[in-house]
A protein has these predicted regions:
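Short, structured surface patches at the beginning of a domain
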Residues: 1-130
């Protein structure tokens, strides 16, 4: 029996983005802001599950994909466990636009993963990729 595919929201903030102060809070304010943005978006999308899994990389640069949460997400994609990935904007997914574009154009379509970037108004489903 195949496991049910998940809708995942991915949150990221690097230390360089300026909102991470060691020892002052469990997570940055920007992470909380990204979470609220995605939760509000999902409320108005009947084709998305309200029971989403969250993956967070707080304090990691987006210039490469070598982040614990991102590596977990990519393993899940390759295992066929992910239906949808939602980010607030593309820079939260990757600041390396060539590498990020490779996943958006090649990897995610191969695994039939829908990718949504809210602020960029990008939805791969509307592009006919999934």
């Amino acid at each position: 029996m195949q496991e049910e595919q998940l809708d995942i929201y991915y949150l990221r903030l690097s230390k360089e983005d300026g909102d991470v102060e060691a020892g002052t809070a469990e997570e940055s304010m920007s992470i909380a802001s990204q979470r609220r943005c995605i939760e509000q978006f999902v409320l108005h999308q009947p084709d998305l599950s309200l029971e989403m899994e969250e993956i967070v990389d707080d304090g990691y640069s987006g210039t490469n994909m070598d982040r614990p949460g991102m590596q977990r997400l990519l393993r899940m994609v390759k295992a066929g466990l992910v239906r949808t990935i939602i980010v607030r904007d593309l820079s939260r997914f990757s600041r390396n636009y060539l590498e990020g574009g490779y996943y958006l154009e090649c990897v995610f379509p191969l695994y039939h993963v829908r990718f949504i970037s809210i602020n960029d108004r990008f939805d791969s489903k509307q592009m006919g990729e999934n």
